[in-house]
């Protein structure tokens, strides 16, 4: 009897020990997942230092800003953006940007910015105030970040929470296929979403993107986009169109048209969402007007 009792006690102690160990592992794992957030208050400004600057092309650069510690993440939900603000020539300038780095990355955040220099574009002789200011920053100098901001949040597995305006409650929209229309730097929120979807093995949402630019040299994040297209050919389809295509160009030419949308985006459906980001004339005339013509419901469209 004593041997049996001792054995039972040992078994009971072993079970308790394993249970406690599993609890501790789960608790520690849960804590490890919750990295400290940088953006705690969407109305507060957080000065972040420039820690690296990399030239991507003749007029495009990657700016890496340091977070408060190597353990911090930015804290930006997928679909949201940040505002950068700075006093430039005595005036406050504010611009919206979507990071290209994942929000799971610790210690830093990356922005890809096209720098609009003075006396290059006839319509904008002064160039871009914020982009030139960013380009002028020296390593260690700071700029104010504010966020998260935006009316759209991607939850998971095709679920979007979309607010009609800042005062409204979000409405849930579920999509099996996401159509995307991007122009120029409007590609950044699209890449953010594409990465989130394709990196989640449990997310079967499909994405189809039409990316419009003036020339082949203007295509931002081309390597990143084509890498995803090659590694997820059934889930992500990519199509370019250029105003001035080079000889032998195998993609589209000219503005985004109804025929182009019909060929490269999913057809209108209740389980289709179409996202747009680019210059206002493109959004209105090339995107919205053609989507209306093709019968895409307004409830399934969103322009960043």
UniProtKB/Swiss-Prot annotation:
Class of this enzyme: oxidoreductase
Protein function: NADH-cytochrome b5 reductases are involved in desaturation and elongation of fatty acids, cholesterol biosynthesis and drug metabolism.
Record keyword Cell cycle present: no
EC code(s) of this entry: 1.6.2.2
Catalytic activity field: 2 Fe(III)-[cytochrome b5] + NADH = 2 Fe(II)-[cytochrome b5] + NAD(+) + H(+)
GO molecular function, one term: cytochrome-b5 reductase activity, acting on NAD(P)H
Compartment(s) of residence: Membrane
Positions in coiled-coil regions: none
Annotated SUPFAM superfamilies: Ferredoxin reductase-like, C-terminal NADP-linked domain, Riboflavin synthase domain-like
Chain ranges passing through the membrane: 9-29
UniProt: FAD binding residues: 135-150, 174-209
Annotated source species: Xenopus tropicalis (Western clawed frog)
Entry keywords, A to Z: FAD, Flavoprotein, Lipid biosynthesis, Lipid metabolism, Membrane, NAD, Oxidoreductase, Steroid biosynthesis, Steroid metabolism, Sterol biosynthesis, Sterol metabolism, Transmembrane, Transmembrane helix
Cofactor(s) this protein requires: FAD
Topological relation to the membrane, as annotated: Single-pass membrane protein
Name under which the protein is recorded: NADH-cytochrome b5 reductase 2
């Amino acid at each position: 009897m004593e041997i049996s009792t001792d054995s039972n006690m040992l078994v009971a102690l072993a079970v308790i020990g394993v249970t406690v160990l599993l609890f501790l592992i789960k608790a520690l794992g849960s804590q490890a997942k919750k990295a400290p957030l940088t953006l705690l208050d969407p109305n507060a400004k957080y000065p972040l230092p420039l820690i690296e600057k990399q030239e991507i092309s003749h007029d495009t650069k990657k700016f890496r800003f340091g977070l408060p510690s190597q353990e911090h993440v930015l804290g930006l939900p997928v679909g949201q953006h940040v505002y950068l603000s700075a006093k430039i020539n005595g005036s406050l300038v504010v611009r919206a940007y979507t990071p290209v780095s994942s929000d799971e990355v610790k210690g830093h955040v990356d922005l890809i910015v096209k720098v609009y220099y003075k006396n290059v574009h006839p319509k904008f002789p002064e160039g871009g105030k914020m982009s030139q200011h960013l380009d002028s920053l020296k390593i260690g100098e700071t700029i104010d970040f504010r966020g998260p901001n935006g009316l759209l949040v991607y939850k998971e597995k095709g679920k979007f929470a979309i607010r009609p305006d800042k005062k409204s409650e979000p409405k849930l929209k579920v999509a099996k296929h996401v159509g995307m229309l991007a122009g120029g730097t409007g590609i950044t929120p699209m890449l953010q979403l594409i990465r989130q979807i394709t990196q989640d093995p449990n997310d079967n949402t499909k994405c189809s993107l039409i990316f419009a630019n003036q020339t082949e040299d203007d295509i931002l994040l081309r390597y990143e986009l084509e890498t995803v297209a090659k590694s997820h050919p059934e889930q992500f389809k990519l199509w370019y169109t250029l105003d001035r295509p080079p000889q032998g160009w195998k993609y589209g030419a000219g503005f985004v048209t109804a025929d182009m949308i019909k060929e490269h985006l999913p057809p209108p459906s209740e389980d289709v969402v179409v996202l747009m980001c680019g210059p206002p004339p493109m959004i209105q005339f090339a995107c919205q007007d053609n989507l209306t013509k093709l019968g895409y419901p307004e409830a399934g469209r969103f322009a960043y």
